[in-house]
């Protein structure tokens, strides 16, 4: 039977989005580029097969699933495996299959802890187990978003007393796996242009992922800030410590004034 894991709090042990994808791709020899691709449920099914051989009807898992009803079928297989191994976790299938970053990221963070608590280190050939199948990429994940308007970074109508510093959230985008290099000695200019466009699209998707992740965590910090402001008159030392951490900045960092040239420098 499985070792159940109930802690879902954010800790320093939680992996970042990039580290989580790297762990999944390395463990299952997949080529995922987005957390949202976990919405098919196929990766979780194979992880269960790795942890508890025979607990999942892996042959019934649709690794090439592209439609929501196929995702739901995969999660039903996962639920059956959970029940068979005594896993108490309730799978929020209706949320996961929508392919939203936040829901899928929270679930995979729990699953990573569950995996670590149950993995015994035995050898496992993921490609052979799934008979060479590769996961499909949903059309919405590969369509270039060249004309998609960007959401403003600050959309709150009520400005905080002191803005939360977000200078650490700007990360250099890295091209994810999946870009196929062609032999430079074969093909022509059209092939090179197509390859460059593919790389540009991958980078754009990576940037969008980073922006989603940034907004996700910034929203959590903003909620914490509002709670602190609502209770600031209580003189609670723990509350004051939280406020100090929220407003802490790196040495030498100056919060730019609203309006003026500084805002233009932040655009990219």
UniProtKB/Swiss-Prot annotation:
Q: Where is this region: DCTN1-binding?
A: 208-268
Question: Low complexity: which segments have biased composition?
Answer: 146-160
A molecular function GO annotation = microtubule plus-end binding
May I have one GO cellular component term?
microtubule
**Mostly located where?**
cytoplasm
Calponin-homology (CH) domain boundaries:
14-116
Kindly list the positions at which Phosphoserine occurs in this protein: 155, 165
Residues that bear N-acetylalanine: 2
Q: Where is this region: APC-binding?
A: 220-242
Which region ranges are annotated with the description Interaction with SKA1? 232-255
UniProt domain EB1 C-terminal: residue ranges: 185-255
Source organism, top-level taxon: Eukaryota
Kindly give the Gene3D superfamilies that the UniProt entry links to this protein: 1.20.5.1430, Calponin-like domain
Q: What is known of its domains?
A: Composed of two functionally independent domains. The N-terminal domain forms a hydrophobic cleft involved in microtubule binding and the C-terminal is involved in the formation of mutually exclusive complexes with APC and DCTN1.
What task does this protein carry out?
Answer: Plus-end tracking protein (+TIP) that binds to the plus-end of microtubules and regulates the dynamics of the microtubule cytoskeleton. Recruits other +TIP proteins to microtubules by binding to a conserved Ser-X-Leu-Pro (SXLP) motif in their polypeptide chains. Promotes cytoplasmic microtubule nucleation and elongation. Involved in mitotic spindle positioning by stabilizing microtubules and promoting dynamic connection between astral microtubules and the cortex during mitotic chromosome segregation.
Its subunit composition reads: Homodimer. Heterodimer with MAPRE3. Interacts with DCTN1, DCTN2, TERF1 and dynein intermediate chain. Interaction with DIAPH1 and DIAPH2. Interacts (via C-terminal residues 206-211) with APC (via C-terminal residues 2674-2845); the interaction inhibits association with and bundling of F-actin. Interacts with CLASP2, DST, KIF2C and STIM1; probably required for their targeting to the growing microtubule plus ends. Interacts with MTUS2; interaction is direct and probably targets MTUS2 to microtubules.
Q: Which family does it belong to?
A: Belongs to the MAPRE family.
Tell me the protein's name: Microtubule-associated protein RP/EB family member 1
UniProt lists the gene as MAPRE1
